[in-house]
Amino acid sequence: MTDEQTPAEDVAFEADDASQEIEALKLEVAALKDQALRYAAEAENTKRRAERESNDARAYAIQKFARDLLGAADNLSRATAMSPRDSQDPAVTNYIIGVEMTEKELQGAFERNGLKKIDPAKGEKFDPHLHQAVMEQPSTEVAAGGVLQVLQAGYELMGRLVRPAMVAVAAKGSTGPGAPAEPAAAPNPYASNGADTGGSFDTKA
């Protein structure tokens, strides 16, 4: 306190200094809090990126192996599809059961390792991201653009397409369920009442 300052002025001066110091501390706390939040966000982004890279590396590592196994899966599928299920021979029946069990176990192993089968149902809409059209046929059972038949199942690995499903697609103009209705014929403006053919003109003056 100087000779000119009163005790009240001295107290006010000290209070002003304290107020400024408090404001400075508040700004520092806010800055530290913002920095901590940014560090936390960066850590979370780093964690997610590491997980994504790990999944990508895992998918890449087994992709070639999975693709090599698809041939075996296709052969098993064809074998079960062509098996004589009405055979009375116990040996043939047991053989068919064995092939079906092997195919089921292989598909189970695929699914456990992230390899998902793409086998669209009849009538399902063609998806260019998952399907490959190898032929088009007119159909009265499936609307145009729908899957008529799966010629070879496709597969995707952890969201990545390994092989598209080879399918036959209903051609344009197919009249299956869901096909757009034919537009109604426009009325003939020259038709007489009750008829749809052109009426006669009055040629009298």
UniProtKB/Swiss-Prot annotation:
The keyword Cytoplasm applies. It comes from the Bacteria. Its main location: cytoplasm. Residues 177-195 have a biased composition (Low complexity). Gene3D superfamilies: 3.90.20.20, Head domain of nucleotide exchange factor GrpE (2.30.22.10). CDD domains: GrpE (cd00446). The keyword Cytoplasm applies. Transmembrane segments: none annotated. GO terms for molecular function: adenyl-nucleotide exchange factor activity; protein homodimerization activity; protein-folding chaperone binding; unfolded protein binding. InterPro entries: GrpE (IPR000740), GrpE_coiled_coil (IPR013805), GrpE_head (IPR009012). One of its GO terms (cellular component) is cytoplasm. It is found in: Cytoplasm. Keywords: Chaperone, Cytoplasm, Stress response. Residues 172-205 are annotated as: Disordered. GO terms for biological process: protein folding. Homodimer. Participates actively in the response to hyperosmotic and heat shock by preventing the aggregation of stress-denatured proteins, in association with DnaK and GrpE. It is the nucleotide exchange factor for DnaK and may function as a thermosensor. Unfolded proteins bind initially to DnaJ; upon interaction with the DnaJ-bound protein, DnaK hydrolyzes its bound ATP, resulting in the formation of a stable complex. GrpE releases ADP from DnaK; ATP binding to DnaK triggers the release of the substrate protein, thus completing the reaction cycle. Belongs to the GrpE family. This is Protein GrpE. The gene is grpE.
